[in-house]
Amino acid sequence: MSGMWGNKIKISIFGESHGNAIGINIDGLEPGFEINLDKVSSEMKRRAPGRSNLSTPRKEADEPEILSGFFQGKTTGTPLCAIIRNNNTKSKDYGKLKDIMRPGHADYTGKIRYNDFNDYRGGGHFSGRITASIVFAGAICKQILEAKGIKIVSHIKSIGTIEDKSFLDEKITEGFINSYMSKELPLIDELKEEAMRKEILLAKEELDSIGGTVECAVLGIEPGIGNPFFDSVESTLAHLMFSIPAVKGIEFGRGFELTQMRGSQANDSMYFSGEKVLTKTNNNGGILGGITNGMPVIFKVAIKPTSSILKSQNTVNINTGEETVLEVNGRHDPCIVQRALPVIEAATAIGILDLIEN
């Protein structure tokens, strides 16, 4: 089923944007791991809306209620289930949209797939709201990985045409690792922040939206993790990335840029650092043959512009069979790239932990 994923670490998500709650069930966690709930809360706040004028004013407490699998501060080893209540919904904003298909959304595809029984309010089960559950699960997986010496970090690589530097070219410093989570727009080159803010606010002023890219790195991962072909590190992470609404592309290392290189440029020269084998460059993103080589796993994800915009758009009324003009009301993000970072990190943590445990 589409709501389930995993081999050793199995997750199952449920709920709709305007339902009573959303939630997740996590199976396969080892017993006795102490979960820092403050760290979980910090991750949830990074994804939550309403932090500034760069995101939707819709505010949700996003406080997970753990129902099972957690006792006296530690995992029990049985399925860990949690829900997150939906407290700030305006379903009336969607009453007129039952038959009018919103461009860029899954209204039409969901209606067809579920024979018109889908909950269309706020996108229902297709909503980015559901990613709050993924962030909760990922926050736990991140803590387990950190106990193994593995850290996952990310930054905004681009907003529109404004580009930040890359993890492939810049050393990921302890200063960045310790501070990026507290920033609304985590960047390597902080001089780009003002231009990115202006780009987002310009899209908002024009009743439009804008997309961008996020670059993610897995640090401290040992060589030999993963499998060739169908269960490769790339296919595992790509599977999870494309489960995030708005993700439309992924590339590992230099990705598509490799197509413009010669083999002598693309190949990462190897050398010894003590007993470790490292590479002088990381063009392949720390993965060869679907298996980690000991270098940081680095990949970039493309986030499309928010589909809900206040500009008029041409669409269809599926009930009357007529073409019509859609004018959307409600509370929407001019850009979701900055809110996608913790979701991408969370999905990465789930995938990497599953690969290690499996």
Question: Residues of each region from the PLM?
Answer:
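N-terminal, positively charged regions that mediate nucleic acid binding
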Residues: 1-58
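Internal helix-turn-beta structural module
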Residues: 10, 82, 306-358
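A short glycine/serine-rich beta->alpha loop
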Residues: 10-15, 118-130, 223-227, 282-287, ...
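Glycine-rich anion/phosphate-binding loop at the beta-strand->alpha-helix junction
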Residues: 14-20, 207-323
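Alpha-helical support elements that line or immediately flank enzyme active sites
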Residues: 20-32, 129-150, 154, 231-239, ...
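Glycine-rich, N-terminal phosphate-binding loop and its surrounding beta-alpha-beta segment
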Residues: 43-103, 107-109
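Short acidic, glycine/tyrosine-flanked loop/strand segments centered on an H-E-D-like triad
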Residues: 98-124, 316-332
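Glycine-rich, mobile lid/loop segments that gate access to catalytic sites or pores
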Residues: 113-226
